[in-house]
């Protein structure tokens, strides 16, 4: 357990908040921002429930976020404290560390980001980096991200980095690119139809000690998608093909093989009534940080 002084941290944040308010007057010098989320659990013995001993009577999940923006530039830092993690969260989170930070520049058609990357390709069947504090999930990449819109209706994305695994970054490399074209706006600008096609490629290069020598170190994923909407009707789908990797079968045996994901959906959104239908099929369809199969959160 690291020696974090949380009360001192709260005082520092309060002082910083006052500084932020003072800086609001000087908008030409940029804009500071900050947030503090702190969650606490207090635990005690309960003979009726059979809880005879409590290892940690107090636990906290605390997150301090600081940001600064100036014209087209944005910068951010996030400091996490799990002293220790609250019950229900993996003990792998224990500790306190400055885990995430980023620098970002946004232009008219181009966005560049270095540091912590949160991104999603398509519907997120294979590639989605996100933070869900309530569930103890954060699989952000530490690397780089490019978003480019060379023409109206055309979007290209590129990501590269190493994924976060609890309080460390895994010795794994993730590379990916995604492209989408809005054919509706390009071919039928006056029709009001949305017709977009897209696809992406994601590669995971597992260089960790968790890598199983019987499995390929490199896992490749290819996907295509289609979205169509007109008036009250919408439909679409996405298909993902995955190269060979380890996975659990229905009997919890470790298998090795290719995978695929299929997502189809349709909907009607009329005044006073709505209808939607979704079909999903998954076969070895997830992409984990590494070949360690015993933790669902990574």
Can you say where each PLM-predicted feature lies in the sequence?
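N-terminal secretory signal peptides that target proteins for export/translocation
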Residues: 1-4
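Bacterial N-terminal signal peptides
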Residues: 7-18
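Signature for the C-terminal beta-barrel architecture of outer-membrane proteins
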Residues: 24-32, 37, 41-60, 69-75, ...
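Phosphate/ribose-recognition catalytic cores of enzymes acting on nucleotide-derived substrates
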Residues: 100
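Extended assembly-interface regions of large multimeric machines
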Residues: 118-120
């Amino acid at each position: 357990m690291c020696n974090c002084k949380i009360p001192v941290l709260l005082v520092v944040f309060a002082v910083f908040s006052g500084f932020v308010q003072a800086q609001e007057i000087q908008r030409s010098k940029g804009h500071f921002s900050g947030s503090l989320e702190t969650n606490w659990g207090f635990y005690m013995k309960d003979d009726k429930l059979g809880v005879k001993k409590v290892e940690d009577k107090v636990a906290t999940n605390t997150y301090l976020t600081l940001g600064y923006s100036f014209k087209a530039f944005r910068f951010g830092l996030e400091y996490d404290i799990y002293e220790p993690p609250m019950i229900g969260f993996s003990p792998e989170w224990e500790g306190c560390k400055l885990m995430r930070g980023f620098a970002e520049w946004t232009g008219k058609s181009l966005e560049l980001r270095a540091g912590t990357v949160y991104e999603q390709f398509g519907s997120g069947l294979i590639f989605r980096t996100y933070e869900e504090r309530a569930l103890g999930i954060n699989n952000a990449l530490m690397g780089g991200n490019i978003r480019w819109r060379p023409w109206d209706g055309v979007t290209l994305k590129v990501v590269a980095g190493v994924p976060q695994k609890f309080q460390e970054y895994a010795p794994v490399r993730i590379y990916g690119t995604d492209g989408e074209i809005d054919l509706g706006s390009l071919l039928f600008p006056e029709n009001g139809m949305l017709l977009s096609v897209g696809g992406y490629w994601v590669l995971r290069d597992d260089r960790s000690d968790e890598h199983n020598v019987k499995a390929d170190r490199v896992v490749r994923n290819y996907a295509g998608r289609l979205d169509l909407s007109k008036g009250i009707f919408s439909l679409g789908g996405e298909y993902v093909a995955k190269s060979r990797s380890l996975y659990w079968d229905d009997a919890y045996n470790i298998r090795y093989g290719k995978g695929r994901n299929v997502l189809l959906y349709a909907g009607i959104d009329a005044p006073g009534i709505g209808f939607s239908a979704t079909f999903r099929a998954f076969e070895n369809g997830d992409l984990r940080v590494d070949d360690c199969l015993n933790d669902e959160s990574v």
